[in-house]
Amino acid sequence: KASQHVVVANELLDNLAFGIAERVEGGWAPVHIGLGLSELSLQVQQPDPALDHLTGLAPDAALSDRVPVASEARAWVADACVLARRVLVFDYAATTAELAERGQASWLRTYAAHTRGHDPLDQIGQRDITHDVPTDQLPTPYLQQTQADWLAANGMGDRVEAARQVWTERAHIGDLQAIAARSAI
């Protein structure tokens, strides 16, 4: 039974290991890193029945559309739900169908020294590789909402408006109150 604890995961799930699947004739196929003639490349494997669930999540995906397969994120959330009564997750996210439509270049990112890269095979081991989390591949949540909606529901809109008022009144003074208000906007 879950304890009375709360687990908060801020931009964690997008950093867990994930796979990539491509829509092919006959289903979905894993995409692996392989050695081409002289360099590494992303290589599409044979369709895998273990990925058939993606058809239900992205029924309109076109051939060659790719999506992340978030098995580790799903397992992490499931484990956290066993340990804690509440699990709050903040992350870049969308549905599997939305990710398929947007394309791999929009949901797969690399970073090194806070600078975004482009090719996930460039400088392997020296860059972080992240992805937008497919929410429909996670355990079904009690409540799912955008960060903006969550902040508004928890009074952030009122706080921002109050800070905006202080900034309007004190910006010309430039004191600590004005600076604090500006940082809250």
Language-model regions, residue ranges each:
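S-adenosyl-L-methionine
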Residues: 1-5
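A mobile, often basic/glycine-rich helix-loop segment
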Residues: 8-57, 101-113
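Long, Lys/Arg- and hydrophobic-enriched amphipathic alpha-helices
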Residues: 50-185
